A protein has these predicted regions:
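Cytosolic, long alpha-helical scaffolding segments
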Residues: 1-138
Length: 138
């Protein structure tokens, strides 16, 4: 289900990437390249995770990816806010960028979840990851 949702989000994101990558506005181009790079970095890291024989390593790298994702969200929101205040992008661009940043975060989050499901077989390690997730929510 996460894979199907990621594909759906990717289709929505792809429309605006195509539109804004060819824009004359360098600021919006940079932001969409930033989104593309974040997704690409995640996919590359997941490929590295896939080749790991150590399931604890898979879990720890997955958690590091999640921390990276949180940092991206904070940075992206701050950057978009600055671009709006400095009138570097218009309201329509800002709305698209906020929505697409959200979709990119969903895609990355789901890819991380799928990677853990696919490459962690040991139930104890899976539970350890779930316990860690639950403890962060308190």
């Amino acid at each position: 289900r996460d894979i199907a949702e990621s594909v759906k989000n990717t289709k929505e994101l792809q429309k605006n990437i195509k539109k804004y990558i060819s824009s004359n506005n360098g600021y919006i181009k940079d932001e969409y390249n930033y989104i593309r790079e974040a997704i690409a970095k995640t996919i590359n890291t997941i490929n590295e995770i896939k080749n790991s024989k150590d399931e604890i390593d898979v879990l720890s790298k997955s958690e590091l990816l999640k921390e990276y994702l949180k940092g991206l969200d904070v940075i992206a929101t701050r950057r978009i806010d600055i671009l709006i205040r400095e009138k570097r992008i218009d309201k329509k661009m800002a709305t698209s960028l906020l929505n697409d940043s959200y979709h990119a975060n969903l895609i990355i989050s789901r890819l991380i979840s799928v990677s853990k499901v696919l490459w962690i077989q040991d139930l104890t390690i899976k539970e350890l990851g779930e316990d860690y997730e639950a403890s962060k929510n308190f």
